[in-house]
């Protein structure tokens, strides 16, 4: 898994059908109609840790392979 910037993760989730609902503090909150829970993506100037990216992918209901195709 490559190291990604927060903007890259948000863009990939948007391609997967997620919408930005709000930008609260240092996090972007994204929703998708068929998921009950929102996805929170940290918006820091540095790259996201691999564990954080994997957690976001898991919460979004995607596999790593599906997510990589969206990049």
Language-model segment annotations:
Residues 1-23, 27-71:
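Basic nucleic-acid-binding interfaces
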């Amino acid at each position: 898994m490559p190291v990604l910037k927060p903007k890259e993760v948000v863009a990939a989730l948007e391609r997967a059908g997620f919408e930005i609902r709000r930008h609260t503090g240092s996090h972007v909150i994204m929703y998708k109609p068929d998921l009950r829970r929102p996805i929170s993506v940290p918006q820091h100037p540095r790259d996201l840790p691999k564990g954080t990216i994997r957690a976001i992918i898991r919460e979004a209901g995607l596999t790593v392979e599906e997510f990589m195709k969206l990049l």
